[in-house]
């Protein structure tokens, strides 16, 4: 008890341990409330991948959740790590089985599984006379971001066990050629196959890299467990990705602005003028096109240097190797080139403006021509989808890529998957017909 007039006694401060405990309890309570809120609102931002010592990464068996980065679809990975329904590895006698290899277009997490082109293909091929009453299965081995080299490794590691009658490779022309080359892909956490003389040599140096070693560590495994079981980690990851995407968009706008300024400066230096009064699109100099520096768009130009020529040679060798391994097991091998957004943008004027920015020699179907030439040289069956998909989009005035707010960009939407699946089924049905009625091997359709 204090004496009258004396200063009040100060209460002792809580110890540091107590203060830390209070802060920790407050944080945990806030996270608990946040977790409950996210679960009640059914928020999720799932990750579907895990590291793999052969392929770099694969889909995580059993992973599932809503994918909302592009489009909206509930994605479930089956028990064998495929974005597909459950499949039996042993092939029944009455089944015609197609194994699909590809990247994000084949994985198709942007749409419901039943709307994906491979599901459309499966249904339509079932009506094909060449199926001869057999039940058709199109099994999807596609994984987002895979290079052709990773797809060849997938063929060796995973596809063979399913005993397919046909192996179908879907090529995304605006990045598959470059994804096989480390200097272009700029990724050190995946395997590569490199040309060595007339063959391919593995480059598995990614296994010794810090990034892959961390992903396979106990700490990373614990992190994946937390991510699989706690929704608030999804919210933090989404915020991180949104922040990175906005930074990338700002950088892209800055690069485009700088390229346009260089183009205008070059035009002034050459005695050029501003845009013609009639509104016609000015024709830039070859090195001044704003899109020329975009790696994905360089595929529409003739290979400009040894790096690009080497990338095309490697792609050809990978396809030949894949065909040889498939046919050695008694199956047939088909290649299909899909479509890039600008190729099927339903506005000829927009496509023409894009080509003008790229400069002289640009050809929207240049990649298809080069793949067709590969087919003719090597006896590969190549289906070129983009030209007919462009005609389809123009005739119907429909976007095959993108969703409201970003129509014409990104991956195939439901319209694109449906059109591609139906077109591919038609082309494959013709090729699967008895040999007397089929087009000769090594052609393109």
Residue ranges of model-derived segments:
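N-terminal secretory targeting modules
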Residues: 1-97, 112, 161-165, 178-181, ...
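Serine-dependent acyl-ester chemistry module
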Residues: 14, 115, 172-380, 385-395
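Histidine-centered active-site loop/cap adjacent to the catalytic His
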Residues: 33, 404-445
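Membrane-water interface at transmembrane helix exits
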Residues: 34-38, 42, 122, 425, ...
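Generic structural signal for small/hydrophobic residues in well-ordered secondary structure
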Residues: 35, 103, 151, 167, ...
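Conserved SGNH/GDSL esterase-like catalytic core that processes O-acyl groups on lipids
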Residues: 72-76, 88, 92-93, 97-99, ...
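Extracytoplasmic/secreted envelope proteins and their assembly/folding machinery
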Residues: 118, 122, 152-156, 316-319, ...
């Amino acid at each position: 008890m204090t004496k009258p007039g004396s200063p009040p006694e100060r209460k002792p401060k809580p110890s540091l341990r107590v203060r830390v405990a209070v802060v920790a309890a407050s944080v945990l309570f806030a996270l608990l409330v946040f977790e409950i809120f996210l679960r009640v609102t059914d928020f999720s931002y799932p990750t579907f991948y895990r590291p793999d010592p052969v392929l770099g990464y694969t889909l995580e068996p059993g992973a599932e959740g809503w994918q909302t980065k592009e489009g909206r679809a509930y994605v479930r990975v089956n028990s064998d790590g495929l974005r597909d329904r459950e499949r039996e590895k042993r092939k029944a006698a009455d089944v015609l089985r197609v194994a699909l290899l590809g990247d994000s277009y084949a994985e198709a997490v942007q749409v419901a599984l039943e709307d994906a082109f491979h599901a459309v293909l499966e249904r339509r091929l079932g009506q094909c006379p060449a199926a001869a009453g057999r039940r058709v299965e199109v099994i999807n081995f596609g994984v987002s971001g895979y290079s052709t080299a990773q797809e060849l490794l997938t063929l060796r590691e995973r596809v063979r066990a399913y005993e397919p009658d046909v192996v179908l490779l879907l090529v995304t022309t605006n990045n598959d050629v470059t994804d096989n080359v480390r200097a272009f892909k700029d990724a050190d956490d995946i395997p590569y196959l490199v040309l060595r003389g007339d063959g391919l040599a593995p480059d598995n140096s990614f296994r010794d890299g810090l990034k892959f070693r961390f992903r396979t560590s106990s700490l990373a495994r614990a992190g994946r467990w937390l991510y699989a079981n706690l929704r608030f980690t999804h919210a933090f990851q989404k915020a991180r990705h949104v922040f990175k995407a906005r930074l990338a968009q700002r950088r892209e706008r800055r690069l485009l602005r700088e390229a346009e300024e260089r183009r205008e400066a070059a035009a002034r230096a050459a005695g050029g003028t501003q845009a013609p009064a009639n509104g016609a699109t000015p024709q830039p100099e070859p090195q001044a096109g704003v899109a020329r520096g975009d790696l994905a768009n360089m595929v529409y130009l003739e290979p400009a240097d040894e790096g690009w020529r080497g990338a095309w040679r490697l792609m050809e060798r990978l396809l030949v190797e894949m065909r040889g391994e498939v046919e050695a097991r008694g199956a047939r091998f088909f290649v299909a080139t899909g479509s890039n957004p600008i190729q099927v943008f339903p506005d000829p004027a927009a496509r023409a403006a894009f080509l003008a920015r790229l400069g002289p020699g640009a050809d929207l179907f240049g990649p298809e021509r080069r793949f067709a030439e590969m087919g003719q040289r090597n006896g590969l069956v190549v289906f070129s989808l983009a030209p007919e998909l462009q005609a389809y989009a123009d005739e119907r005035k429909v976007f095959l890529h993108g969703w409201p707010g970003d129509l014409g960009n990104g991956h195939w939407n439901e319209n694109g998957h449906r059109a591609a699946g139906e077109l591919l089924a038609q082309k494959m049905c013709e090729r699967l017909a008895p040999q007397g009625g089929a087009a000769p091997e090594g052609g393109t359709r």
